[in-house]
């Protein structure tokens, strides 16, 4: 088996080169050299610190982007149309993500992970989405939600048991939404009743991503319904647990290769050791994971929009009408420039939010801004690309119509665009 670029990185097979030049009297802590935080991307000029642009990356970041791009073009691109048509993710794609080290990007090396930065996760998701948003979503959930919940709230025993498998072979699924709990995330009806050393879960979940292939489900249920959201707790449920059933896939408009299923729990019995974190703290964990997850969705929407744009521009530079390239018409040039500017703004919002996470600084408002704006830009970009390509853009012979269908979900999941605006406004109200 070929050794992935991620494995070489983890093994130290690549030399580190940082972006720092400094005097002998100015020492950089070793951890900074391993970071892609803004603090690591600066130089010293005339005794003044000059921060690098948001799109300045470490050598590892650049290497990672190239590795993901190569994998996406060679292993995913040939299967995209078939996966979309059949509404099914090819197992070879999932296996490839694991083999390439893309399913444990931030996970510590002692658990078999790559031990890279949050920004690296964002860059991976963006590159995958340029080819297929469904694959990007699968990778996003595993890295920014499932693994993150274990790393932040799991016991040492849970980490040692689950993380090595989540990094190499086992897909996880985040189970929060219900029929009556969409934007009102904590209006959960699924409950978990204590019975000796066990909890018995009853209820159902809807719109659960990755459910078809997942082997481990992080299920949010209420152990004390009278206490409202303060009774919500996160439970670990294995796929083959008695009483647990996975329903049929939803027949969706977009991201069709990403499975979305209903789950039912009928007297599902799990031990106390299957509680992730503390009893009654599930709502905190869900909020935290969704906040970071929104940056992942922003990256997905950004990559999707960029992939569509990258495919369309060469076409309109070659397509001739009225004796000249359609790109040469000023009206079209202005539209292209407008879209390109919005793409760049979405990229900077997304990267900035990711770097705030790494720096340990408040990021909730910025995450909502990135997710909201990138989703809106994805919808605009893909719609314009179809218009620019004309009739052929409307056919399934070209990928732009799929990008268009995939883009719509960005304004809906991980918090609708209106929910993002509510969050942004709430923070502005507090700031003033």
From Swiss-Prot:
Gene name tied to this protein: Acadsb
CDD domains cross-referenced by the UniProt entry: SCAD_SBCAD
Tissue specificity note: Ubiquitously expressed.
Pfam families: Acyl-CoA_dh_1, Acyl-CoA_dh_M, Acyl-CoA_dh_N
Variation of activity with pH: Optimum pH is 8.0.
Binding site for FAD: 174-183, 207-209, 319, 330, 387-391, 416-418
Assembly mode: Homotetramer.
Reactions catalysed: 2-methylbutanoyl-CoA + oxidized [electron-transfer flavoprotein] + H(+) = (2E)-2-methylbut-2-enoyl-CoA + reduced [electron-transfer flavoprotein]; (2S)-2-methylbutanoyl-CoA + oxidized [electron-transfer flavoprotein] + H(+) = (2E)-2-methylbut-2-enoyl-CoA + reduced [electron-transfer flavoprotein]; (2R)-2-methylbutanoyl-CoA + oxidized [electron-transfer flavoprotein] + H(+) = ethylacryloyl-CoA + reduced [electron-transfer flavoprotein]; butanoyl-CoA + oxidized [electron-transfer flavoprotein] + H(+) = (2E)-butenoyl-CoA + reduced [electron-transfer flavoprotein]
Gene Ontology CC annotations of this record: mitochondrial matrix; mitochondrion
EC number per UniProt: 1.3.8.5
Activity regulation comment: Inhibited by N-ethylmaleimide, hydroxymercuribenzoate, methyl mercury iodide and heavy metals such as Hg2+, Cu2+, and Ag2+.
Native source species: Rattus norvegicus
Co-factor(s): FAD
Active-site residues annotated for this sequence: 414 (proton acceptor)
Main function: Among the different mitochondrial acyl-CoA dehydrogenases, acts specifically on short and branched chain acyl-CoA derivatives such as (S)-2-methylbutyryl-CoA as well as short straight chain acyl-CoAs such as butyryl-CoA. Plays an important role in the metabolism of L-isoleucine by catalyzing the dehydrogenation of 2-methylbutyryl-CoA, one of the steps of the L-isoleucine catabolic pathway.
Binding site for substrate: 183, 229, 283, 291-294
Protein's GO biological process: acyl-CoA metabolic process; fatty acid beta-oxidation; fatty acid metabolic process; isoleucine catabolic process
Modified residues (N6-succinyllysine): 70, 278, 284
Alphabetized UniProt keyword annotations: Acetylation, FAD, Fatty acid metabolism, Flavoprotein, Lipid metabolism, Mitochondrion, Oxidoreductase, Phosphoprotein, Transit peptide
PTM sites of type Phosphoserine: 183
Record keyword Heme present: no
Modified positions (N6-acetyllysine) in chain numbering: 70, 284, 426
Lineage: Eukaryota, Metazoa, Chordata, Craniata, Vertebrata
Protein's name according to its UniProt entry: Short/branched chain specific acyl-CoA dehydrogenase, mitochondrial
Pathway the protein contributes to: Lipid metabolism; mitochondrial fatty acid beta-oxidation; Amino-acid degradation; L-isoleucine degradation
């Amino acid at each position: 088996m070929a050794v992935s670029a991620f494995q070489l990185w983890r093994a130290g097979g690549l030399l580190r080169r940082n972006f720092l030049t400094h005097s002998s009297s100015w020492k950089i802590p070793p951890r900074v050299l391993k970071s892609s935080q803004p603090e690591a991307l600066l130089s010293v000029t005339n005794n003044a610190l000059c921060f690098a642009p948001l799109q300045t990356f470490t050598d590892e970041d650049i290497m990672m982007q190239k590795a993901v791009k190569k994998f996406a073009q060679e292993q995913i691109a040939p299967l995209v149309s078939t996966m979309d048509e059949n509404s099914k993710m090819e197992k070879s794609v999932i296996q490839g993500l694991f083999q390439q080290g893309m399913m444990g990007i931030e996970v510590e090396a002692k658990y078999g992970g790559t031990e890279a930065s949050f920004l690296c996760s964002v860059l991976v998701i963006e590159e995958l989405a340029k080819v297929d948003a469904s694959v990007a979503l699968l990778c996003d959930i595993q890295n920014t939600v499932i693994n993150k919940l274990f790393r932040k709230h799991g016991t040492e025993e849970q980490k040692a048991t689950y993380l090595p498998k989540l990094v190499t072979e086992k897909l996880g699924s985040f189970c929060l939404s219900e029929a009556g709990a969409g934007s009102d995330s904590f209006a959960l009806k699924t409950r978990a009743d204590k019975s000796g050393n066990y909890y018995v879960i009853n209820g159902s979940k809807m719109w659960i991503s990755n459910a078809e292939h997942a082997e481990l489900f992080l299920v949010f249920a209420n152990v004390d319904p009278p206490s409202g959201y303060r009774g919500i707790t996160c439970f670990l449920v294995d796929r083959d647990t008695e009483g647990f059933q996975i329903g049929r896939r939803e027949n969706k408009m977009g991201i069709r290769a990403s499975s979305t299923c209903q789950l039912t729990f009928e007297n599902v019995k799990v031990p106390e050791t299957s509680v992730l974190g503390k009893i009654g703290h599930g709502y905190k964990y869900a909020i935290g994971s969704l906040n970071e997850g929104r940056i992942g969705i922003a990256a997905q929407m950004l990559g999707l929009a960029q992939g569509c744009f990258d495919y369309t521009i060469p076409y309109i530079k070659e397509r001739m009408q009225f004796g000249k390239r359609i790109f040469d018409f000023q009206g079209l040039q202005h539209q292209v420039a407008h879209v390109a500017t919005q793409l760049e703004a979405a990229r900077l919002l997304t990267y900035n939010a990711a770097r705030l996470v790494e720096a340990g600084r408040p990021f909730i408002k910025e995450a909502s801004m990135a997710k909201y704006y990138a989703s809106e830009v994805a919808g605009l970009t893909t719609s314009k690309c179809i218009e620019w390509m004309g009739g052929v853009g409307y056919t399934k012979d070209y990928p732009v119509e799929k990008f268009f269908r995939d883009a719509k979900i960005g304004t809906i999941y991980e918090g609708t665009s209106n929910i993002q605006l509510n969050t942004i406004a709430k923070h502005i109200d507090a700031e003033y």
